[in-house]
Design a protein with these regions (language model features):
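Membrane-active amphipathic alpha-helices enriched in small hydrophobic residues
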Residues: 210-262
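Hydrophobic alpha-helical transmembrane segments and adjacent short intramembrane/lumenal linkers
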Residues: 199, 206-213
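N-terminal secretion-targeting helices of virulence/extracellular proteins
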Residues: 1-179, 183-204, 258-472
């Protein structure tokens, strides 16, 4: 059986088998020179007929079904149009390996977002990934802020307490997206195999149109009462019939003596050429329906993940934020601080404040940015391309994939940005121990302006649209 990569060469072979099948129906067989020769009758052999790759000789043959005559060239053209029109749709289907590469790219994000990682007994799909111990620094920073007593530090402490939960949810979202890439990989792996089998069966079905099979012969001889009588018709088998008991079935003797074996059932096979074609048409529809249904399910899964990631966090009855959120509510207390007392109301070593800022800026934020970057590694739309009739359109589930990875990328990047901005606030507070309140107010104003210019979301769910800035 030819594989999917051989499909472009298999298509003309199917055309040729279909033409030969119909020509056999009219009593014409290949002459060994590219043309066809009819069976000789009482009036002698009919004139030879030019083959499909030879100049048109204008020959017509009797139409045994409808009467009159039929153009031989019309037979050639019919199959030369029907077969490629159907099978060319399957050329250029997505490569399963490309979706493994996408899954591996998402794996990078998982290694950054997961504190524990994932292990399994079977890692043939590279499904395992290491945990990220750096995320534990969020707890260290939160504990440090707890002793500073400022309103802003309390706000940011609450933010960091949610950090591990939210980043864990982001990891779950990334894992769900990665699972969809495995589904796409298997869809195209299976579909390519199905197409290869479909093409091979179509070629074989036309090749055997009108053949006399083992079952046909069995049917003819089934009316004979005994094995001995059947084989007795053939002198060469008289020595075989002597020891054969009458209880042995005709079928068994036929198989054992003649060596005839029933061929594997070809779901497309039929005695007539048009019946075979009708079977192929139905199989084509069924195959494309299966691909379409499967990819639609993947597309729906990606859309559902997007809806969860992009939804505004719910507020519980006790006023706390729903733990299922995928992005962090902005710690407006610390980012709107006007003086150092908003952050620190106790005596703190400035070096400790600076160290806390460094943990946010140099440790936690880069981890988030690495994760975000892996979800925005460039335009991968090309790997989804195929004929629009295959799957759910010419780019399949790409738009849903793009939407959800872009949304998750933005949420993770937002987390990194806010860690940086909080670090800037802490640096300004540390400087205040030397420069005074007026200096810290100016430094904090610069942080506020940086946030506004970034057009970052407000943390209330969703992103600004139409280029609108989010003021503070």
């Amino acid at each position: 059986m030819s594989g999917y990569d051989d499909l472009i060469g298999t298509i003309p072979e199917i055309v040729n088998e279909a033409i030969m099948a119909e020509m056999r129906f009219y009593g014409y067989y290949p002459d060994g020179h590219g043309g066809y020769q009819g069976m000789a009758g009482l009036g002698g052999a009919p004139p030879p007929i030019a083959g499909p790759n030879m100049p048109d000789d204008g020959m017509v043959i009797p139409d045994m079904l409808n009467g009159g005559s039929i153009s031989v060239r019309g037979i050639y053209h019919k199959w030369a149009e029907r077969i490629p029109t159907m099978f060319n749709l399957y050329l250029g289907m997505p490569d399963p390996a490309d979706f493994q590469a996408e899954a591996d790219q998402i794996r990078v994000a998982l290694e950054q977002l997961s504190s524990q990682g994932k292990t399994s007994e079977d890692d043939h799909d590279n499904i395992d990934f290491e945990g990220n111990s750096t995320l534990a620094l969020a707890k260290t920073v939160s504990e440090r802020l707890a002793g500073w007593q400022g309103a802003a530090s309390a706000s940011f402490q609450e933010y960091l307490n949610l950090f591990t939960t939210v980043v864990g949810n982001q990891a779950l979202a990334a894992e769900a997206i990665r699972a969809c890439m495995y589904m796409e990989r298997e869809l195209w792996n299976n579909s390519r195999n199905d197409v290869a089998s479909f093409a091979a069966n179509a070629r074989a079905a036309f090749s055997h149109c009108g053949d006399i099979s083992v079952d046909d012969i069995k049917q003819v001889i089934s009316v004979v009462s005994t094995v001995n009588t059947v084989l007795g018709w053939f002198p060469a088998f008289k020595t075989v019939t002597a020891p054969v008991g009458k209880g042995l079935s005709v079928a068994n003797v036929f198989v054992n003596t003649f060596g005839g074996q029933k061929e594997a059932t070809n779901p497309l096979a039929s005695r007539g050429v048009e019946d075979t074609w009708n079977n192929i048409v139905k199989a084509d529809k069924d195959l494309r329906d299966k691909i379409r249904t499967t990819e639609r399910d993947i597309d729906t899964s990606l859309s559902n993940i997007y809806d969860r990631v992009s939804a505004a966090p719910d507020i519980r009855s006790d006023g706390s934020t729903d733990q299922s959120l995928y992005h962090l509510p902005r710690p407006t207390g610390i980012l709107n601080a006007d003086e150092k007392g908003d952050v620190v109301q106790v005596t703190v070593d400035p070096a400790l404040i600076t160290d806390t800022a460094d943990k946010l800026r140099s440790d936690l934020a880069p981890e988030m940015r690495t994760a975000a970057k892996s979800l925005n590694a460039g335009d991968t739309s090309g790997i989804w391309n195929r004929r629009a009739e295959i799957g759910i359109g010419s780019t399949g589930a790409y738009l849903s994939y793009l939407n959800v990875t872009d949304e998750l990328h933005n949420e993770i990047k937002q987390t990194a940005d806010e860690l940086d901005w909080a670090a800037d606030v802490l640096d300004a507070v540390a400087d205040n121990y030397v420069k005074g309140d007026q200096a810290v107010a100016a430094a904090l104003a610069e942080v506020h302006q940086k946030i506004v210019e970034s057009a970052a979301p407000s943390g209330t769910g969703g992103h600004p649209t139409g280029g609108q800035l989010t003021p503070f």
